[in-house]
Amino acid sequence: MSQLQEMMTVVSQREVAYNIFEMVLKGTLVDEMDLPGQFLHLAVPNGAMLLRRPISISSWDKRAKTCTILYRIGDETTGTYKLSKLESGAKVDVMGPLGNGFPVAEVTSTDKILIIGGGIGVPPLYELAKQLEKTGCQMTILLGFASENVKILENEFSNLKNVTLKIATDDGSYGTKGHVGMLMNEIDFEVDALYTCGAPAMLKAVAKKYDQLERLYISMESRMACGIGACYACVEHDKEDESHALKVCEDGPVFLGKQLSL
């Protein structure tokens, strides 16, 4: 696992949905980004808070040495709110890329891939889909949001080749009315590999339905402190060994479904 650190430069920042910001960062850390699903650990500006903020990498451009992160902000007291006030040219203390990402090397052009994302768990799935596009596989992507005003990355996913995209919103303001699990129940083909990231309830539903799938990859969301596996603040139960704890920041955030007790 890489533990590199750099003062990265903010290239741009904008609000892309209600309380959801997109920040583009530039720096040499981008050279280390190879696996989709890893995350960055950002220090809050001006030393305002001790703990860094873990934010997944949504995409990267190695030629430009830039990467993009999307994150949801809290109220004015939160670190994410303070990060959202950074303007172009600002410097950010960044560690990463950290954690284990989504494996893509085994995917072939004949595979039928299912990608399921919910809310702010959607961003890391975009770089995953970009990498899978290169294999020529068929991707069905199911995204769920609370409402249309927090919908993100629809155009980006739609512009990829070999993609069938379906969206659900809890309130019915866009796409299918209901949670993303309703879209999952419409899947009528044999899934070769499944990648998912989102809220615990959604992940539990996915894991239950596809518990026999060998290539089920689940990205866990968790509160983190150190981000490098030292503090044990972000543990999950190991389904294969009850005496062992899995650290989301180091062993994950991406796990095989059979490893987790959800």
Swiss-Prot record:
Cellular component GO terms held in the UniProt record: cytoplasm
Subcellular location: Cytoplasm
Signal sequence annotation: none
Chain positions recorded as [2Fe-2S] cluster binding sites: 226, 231, 234, 249
GO BP annotations listed: 'de novo' UMP biosynthetic process
Residue numbers binding FAD: 53-56, 70-72, 79-80
UniProt cofactor(s): [2Fe-2S] cluster; FAD
Keywords noted in UniProt: 2Fe-2S, Cytoplasm, Electron transport, FAD, Flavoprotein, Iron, Iron-sulfur, Metal-binding, Pyrimidine biosynthesis, Transport
Record-level Gene Ontology MF annotations: 2 iron, 2 sulfur cluster binding; electron transfer activity; flavin adenine dinucleotide binding; metal ion binding; oxidoreductase activity
Domain FAD-binding FR-type: 3-104
Iron-sulfur is among the record's keywords: yes
Main location: cytoplasm
Matches recorded under PROSITE patterns: FAD_FR (PS51384)
Pathway recorded for this protein: Pyrimidine metabolism; UMP biosynthesis via de novo pathway; orotate from (S)-dihydroorotate (NAD(+) route): step 1/1
Binding note for cofactor: Binds 1 [2Fe-2S] cluster per subunit.
InterPro entries per the UniProt record, alphabetical: Cyt_c3_hydrogenase_gsu, Dihydroorotate_DH_ele_sf, Dihydroorotate_DH_Fe-S-bd, Dihydroorotate_DHASE_ETsu, FAD-bd_FR_type, FNR_nucleotide-bd, OxRdtase_FAD/NAD-bd, PyrK_electron_transfer
Family to which the UniProt record says this protein belongs: Belongs to the PyrK family.
Subunit: Heterotetramer of 2 PyrK and 2 PyrD type B subunits.
Role, per record: Responsible for channeling the electrons from the oxidation of dihydroorotate from the FMN redox center in the PyrDB subunit to the ultimate electron acceptor NAD(+).
Name of this protein: Dihydroorotate dehydrogenase B (NAD(+)), electron transfer subunit
Species, as recorded: Lactococcus lactis subsp. cremoris (strain MG1363)
